[in-house]
């Protein structure tokens, strides 16, 4: 079989990005949760999704929201939990959960929370990548080295950017200028699946992880 030229493959990727470029990101529900969803009640229309992310990438960080505790896993991020729309005390602050919203609470080393909004996917045909720059680096870029192109560019410190596209497989690399910070093996991102690339740490020793966005029903 004739191998597809890289230029043609990249053109296909660009077309997918352009067609779905106005869409943003949503978490993927694990297979077990999808199976359980055949019998569970549907997610209420007035519900939103909230997760926490440790600004220093640590596992075991917690935030209490009413009677529920969100805890970061090994990669420094928790699953999304489902909350009815409304206002909730969280740590020393208050968060607003809107219907259909996706919120990431960034927990700083001082215990303070920063709220970042992640827009949901607007199409069942979309998949996506979200990049969080929680490091001391002024900006980071997510790069596709196979194609020599940026996927998500110039994510400033303390902010997040995302991009939606058609399903596919990519090798991904995190860069700060010409400096390579981390590279991830080729992986497939399927329809209605989203992943997060999280960069933390000091400018001279940053850490980058790639995680699936997940939802827990409880």
What positions do the PLM features span?
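Short linear motifs in intrinsically disordered/low-complexity regions
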Residues: 9, 22-23, 213-214
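C-terminal segment of classical bacterial N-terminal signal peptides
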Residues: 20-30
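N-terminal secretory signal peptides that target proteins for export/translocation
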Residues: 1-10
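Intrinsically disordered, low-complexity polar regions and short flexible loop motifs
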Residues: 32-218
């Amino acid at each position: 079989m004739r191998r597809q030229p890289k230029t043609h493959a990249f053109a296909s990727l660009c077309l997918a990005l352009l067609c779905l470029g106005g869409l943003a990101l949503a978490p993927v529900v694990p297979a077990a949760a999808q199976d359980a969803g055949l019998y569970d009640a549907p997610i209420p229309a007035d519900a939103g999704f909230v997760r926490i992310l440790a600004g220093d990438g640590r596992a075991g960080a917690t935030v209490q929201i009413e009677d529920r505790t969100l805890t970061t896993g090994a990669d420094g991020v928790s699953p999304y939990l489902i909350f009815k729309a409304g206002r909730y005390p969280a740590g020393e602050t208050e968060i607003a959960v809107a219907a259909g919203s996706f919120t990431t609470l960034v927990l700083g080393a001082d215990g303070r929370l920063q709220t970042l909004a992640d827009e949901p996917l607007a199409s069942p045909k979309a998949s996506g990548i979200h990049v969080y720059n929680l490091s001391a680096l002024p900006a980071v870029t997510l790069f596709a080295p196979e194609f020599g192109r940026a996927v998500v560019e110039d994510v400033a410190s303390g902010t997040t950017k995302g991009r939606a596209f058609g399903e596919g497989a990519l090798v991904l690399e995190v860069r700060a200028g010409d400096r390579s910070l981390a590279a991830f093996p080729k992986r497939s991102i399927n329809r209605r699946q989203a992943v997060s690339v999280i960069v933390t740490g000091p400018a001279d020793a940053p850490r980058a992880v790639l995680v699936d966005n997940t939802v827990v029903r409880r």
